Amino acid sequence: MRTSHGMQHLEWAGQFGNDYAKRSPGDVQANEVFFARILAAMNADPISAIEFGCGVGNNLRALRTLLPDIALRGVEINESAAILARQVTPLITIGSMLVHEAIISWELAFTKGVLIHIPPVDLPRAYEVLYRASRKYIMVAEYYAPKPTEIEYRGRRDMLWKGPHAYDMLDRYQDLKLLDYGFVSSRDPYPQDDLNWWILEKRP
């Protein structure tokens, strides 16, 4: 297994990522139902949020619908997807989350189906970025496995790993506490991928 994110960076920034963006209109209502559930688990609605790997902006759009006044920012590696995401908020940075430097913090920092595409060796950097970008909440919605487990993705290797992402972060950062967690199913009335989600909260 290659241990650098370089190959993945090139794939997601290039045609592979362009193709993904074309497949990503998504079910708007299902996304709104998902994020309504996430927000309900928080002690208060966040006033700002940053998404790493925001794609075409589906998740940011759902948050904007539910919280019209929320300040939003996204980081997206694929330029074609980022251009579409700017229809939701102009604050979209083109680049990998692994090189993102948090200048300001946001009440909510999150990923949804993104950490699974980062090689396990690079996850500590991704966790650090999420942690530093968050002022209060971190949400991860990813494919879970007790340890990093590679899965073939669209006929490709070195592109997807299930893992214990939230647990890794809880072990790494002692001021993070598990606020809530759950599962969404592809067979729900408002279906998503079969994803586990966790909400972590920074506490003194």
Where are these regions (language model features)?
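Nucleotide-sugar donor-binding/catalytic module of glycosyltransferases
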Residues: G113
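A conserved beta-strand element that flanks and buttresses the S-adenosyl-L-methionine
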Residues: F110
